């Protein structure tokens, strides 16, 4: 992976830059917990939530699209990992996201890896995590989803329980799909986190086929698979072909990288193992996206995630073939107005380019170059 690109200009607001400096004085997982609790508290009350939605939510009709039968008011969603248990279901629409992906959740509850397990790489505007799928379990999330009606689409990202042997992974994913499929706007099968031993081995087509087939058999909800940026090009092609063959709704590309190439933050090696998100994964995420679109075209929905910080980055992904986008690290570094800024920038570029809808822009640069 390459190092971080130059810092984006014009992104964020000065007040958040000051707040971020204060936040970054606190250990990463602790401040995440505190800020997340604050966001939930503010958006739990009707009138603040309605006010925030009025100010931040994507309402421009040019941003709306219907993807695998689900209407998304805007293409930028919150990536999996921020809200692992669906505790903030009403927060994300109020903060300007067009949808949110909850998880990763496993069939049974598990504590994840020992702390410390989340670190900032400020010189790279990146994060390093080895959380290990800490979550309350699929059953708890199912109860929460059944009780609430969020105002934006909610996807659910499912992973393998750490204690489950690889030869029992099919049953593990099947159990989560059975519980959560009827309650989610879409399901993502996560076989690409580097933080569960042996999980990435399940990306091999021979191992992946029975998992995806089992999940598809359990639910009529759209099913996607999330892949790693560290796959070889031939492995990306094989998974794309498998997804088309099985009738998946799409592919989420990409997860975090284990590569340390080109990082600028000092002392990264001392932080230990984990996946890196943010700008260091951006170049490979774009490469994988372009390869996937060239391989499958419009036969699959492509969701691009990894290193999106600005509207220019978002626009590059859309025109390269992404119907939807996701961000997590960009939100951490960009602040509460980040999603609105991205959506506003996309809307402006759609109009400047003469596109009548978001759908018209998806893959446009790939078609021109082809």
UniProtKB/Swiss-Prot annotation:
> Keyword Oxidoreductase on this protein?
yes
Q: Which SUPFAM superfamilies match?
A: FMN-linked oxidoreductases (SSF51395)
Annotated GO biological processes are: 'de novo' pyrimidine nucleobase biosynthetic process; 'de novo' UMP biosynthetic process
Q: Which GO terms describe its molecular function?
A: dihydroorotate dehydrogenase (quinone) activity
Quote the subcellular location field of this record: Cell membrane
Q: What is its EC number?
A: 1.3.5.2
Q: How is the cofactor bound?
A: Binds 1 FMN per subunit.
Q: Does the keyword Methyltransferase apply?
A: no
Q: Fetch the Pfam families from UniProt.
A: DHO_dh (PF01180)
Q: Which UniProt keywords apply?
A: Cell membrane, Flavoprotein, FMN, Membrane, Oxidoreductase, Pyrimidine biosynthesis
* Cofactor(s) the protein requires to work: FMN
> Can you state which reaction this protein catalyses?
(S)-dihydroorotate + a quinone = orotate + a quinol
Residues annotated as binding substrate: 84, 129-133, 190, 195, 255-256
Its pathway, per UniProt, is: Pyrimidine metabolism; UMP biosynthesis via de novo pathway; orotate from (S)-dihydroorotate (quinone route): step 1/1
Query: Which residues are annotated as active site?
Result: 193
Family classification: Belongs to the dihydroorotate dehydrogenase family. Type 2 subfamily.
* HAMAP family, sorted: DHO_dh_type2
Which protein are we looking at? Dihydroorotate dehydrogenase (quinone)
**Native source species:** Mycolicibacterium paratuberculosis (strain ATCC BAA-968 / K-10)
Species lineage, top-down?
Bacteria, Bacillati, Actinomycetota, Actinomycetes, Mycobacteriales
């Amino acid at each position: 992976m390459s190092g971080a690109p130059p810092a984006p200009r014009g992104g964020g607001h000065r007040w958040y830059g000051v707040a971020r400096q204060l936040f970054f004085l606190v250990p990463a997982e602790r401040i995440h917990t505190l800020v997340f609790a604050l966001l939930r508290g503010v958006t739990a009350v009707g009138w603040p939530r309605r006010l925030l939605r009025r100010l931040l939510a994507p309402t421009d009709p040019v941003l709306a699209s219907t993807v695998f039968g689900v209407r998304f008011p805007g293409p930028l969603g919150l990536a999996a990992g921020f809200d692992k248990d669906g505790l903030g279901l009403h927060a994300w629409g109020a903060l300007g996201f067009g949808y949110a992906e909850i998880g990763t959740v496993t069939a049974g509850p598990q504590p994840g890896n020992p702390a410390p397990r989340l670190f900032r790489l400020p010189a790279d505007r990146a994060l390093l995590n080895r959380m290990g799928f800490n979550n309350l379990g699929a059953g708890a999330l199912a109860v929460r989803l059944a009780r609430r009606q969020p105002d934006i689409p909610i996807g659910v990202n499912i992973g393998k329980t750490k204690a489950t042997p690889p030869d029992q992974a099919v049953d593990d994913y099947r159990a989560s799909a059975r519980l959560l499929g009827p309650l989610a706007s879409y399901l993502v099968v996560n076989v690409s986190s580097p933080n569960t031993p042996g999980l990435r081995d399940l990306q091999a087509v021979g191992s992946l086929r029975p998992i995806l087939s089992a999940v598809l058999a359990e639910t009529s909800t759209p099913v996607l698979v999330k892949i790693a940026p560290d796959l070889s090009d031939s492995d990306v092609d094989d998974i794309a072909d498998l997804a088309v063959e099985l009738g998946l709704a799409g592919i989420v590309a990409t997860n975090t990288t284990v590569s340390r190439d080109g990082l600028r933050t000092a002392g990264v090696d001392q932080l230990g193992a984990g996946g890196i998100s943010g700008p260091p994964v951006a170049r490979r995420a774009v490469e994988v996206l372009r390869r996937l679109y060239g391989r499958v075209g419009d036969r699959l929905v492509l969701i691009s995630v990894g290193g999106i910080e600005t509207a220019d980055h978002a626009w590059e992904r859309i025109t390269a073939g992404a119907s939807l986008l996701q961000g997590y690290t960009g939100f951490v570094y960009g602040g509460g107005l980040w999603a609105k800024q991205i959506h506003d920038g996309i809307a402006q570029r759609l109009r400047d380019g003469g596109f009548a809808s978001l759908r018209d822009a998806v893959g446009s640069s790939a078609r021109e170059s082809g």
